[in-house]
């Protein structure tokens, strides 16, 4: 302390100001030592905010409402990889729903385009009729892009109704993906599914034809 005072005197700092700064610093340190957040407190405070109470003449604690219950639930549920990804999927689904609601409220055409492009969940159905007109077959035509265990489904923009035979009906799908290798599967049943593996480079456009 004396060394600091001597150095301060040489630098033109007032001795009284330096002592006052040291005293204030010690007071702040003592107050910080007396305060702590008690997450395991057996007492539960009322209301929605933490309550400051004194345990002793020189100690103060913050009681967080419901903290013991939350910690107990976390300890009971052992975190696993599946539960972690499940929680992430729930948050992403909620975020997506809120995003869709926001863009649905926009009067501009861009809002409807955004919702159609990113927030559609059910693929449109394509109705096809036989030549006799007595039987009706409904098929869900969807393009499936799979990477590992994850799949991204893209649907066509408009459903088509026609009395032509099945082999004369065509459907175009446009899918935007990041560069990489993808397995593309198309089909409405396990027997009719057809798969192509394609490698996409940056800026490359790949055309795939599936006879369905």
UniProtKB/Swiss-Prot annotation:
Name a single GO biological process.
substrate adhesion-dependent cell spreading
Q: Which GO terms describe its cellular component?
A: nucleoplasm; nucleus; perinuclear region of cytoplasm
Q: Which UniProt keywords apply?
A: Nucleus
Location(s) in or outside the cell: Nucleus
- Residues forming coiled coils: none
Instruction: Output the superkingdom of the source species.
Output: Eukaryota
What InterPro entries does UniProt report for this protein, alphabetically? AKIP1
**Signal sequence coordinates:** none
What does the record note on quaternary structure?
Answer: Interacts with PRKACA and RELA.
Q: What does this protein do?
A: Enhances NF-kappa-B transcriptional activity by regulating the nuclear localization of the NF-kappa-B subunit RELA and promoting the phosphorylation of RELA by PRKACA. Regulates the effect of the cAMP-dependent protein kinase signaling pathway on the NF-kappa-B activation cascade.
Database matches in PANTHER family: A-KINASE-INTERACTING PROTEIN 1
Any idea what this protein is called? Answer: A-kinase-interacting protein 1
**Species this chain originates from:** Mus musculus (Mouse)
Q: Source organism lineage?
A: Eukaryota, Metazoa, Chordata, Craniata, Vertebrata
């Amino acid at each position: 302390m004396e060394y600091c005072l001597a150095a301060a005197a040489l630098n033109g700092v007032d001795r009284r100001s330096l002592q006052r700064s040291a005293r204030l610093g010690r007071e702040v340190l003592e107050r910080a030592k007396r305060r702590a957040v008690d997450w395991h407190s057996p007492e539960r405070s009322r209301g929605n905010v933490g309550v400051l109470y004194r345990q002793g003449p020189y100690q103060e604690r913050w009681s967080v409402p419901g903290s013991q219950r939350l910690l107990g639930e976390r300890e009971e549920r052992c975190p696993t990889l599946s539960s972690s990804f499940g929680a992430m999927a729930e948050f992403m689904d909620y975020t997506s729903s809120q995003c869709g609601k926001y863009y649905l409220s926009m009067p501009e055409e861009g809002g409807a385009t955004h919702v159609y492009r990113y927030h559609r969940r059910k693929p449109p159905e394509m109705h096809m009729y036989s030549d006799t007109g007595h039987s009706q077959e409904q098929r869900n035509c969807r393009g499936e892009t799979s990477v590992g265990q994850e799949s991204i489904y893209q649907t066509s923009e408009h459903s088509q109704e026609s009395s032509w035979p099945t082999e004369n009906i065509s459907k175009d799908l446009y899918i935007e993906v990041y560069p990489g290798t993808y397995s593309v599967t198309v089909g409405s049943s396990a027997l009719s599914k057809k798969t192509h593996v394609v490698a996409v480079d940056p800026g490359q456009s790949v055309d795939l034809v599936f006879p369905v």
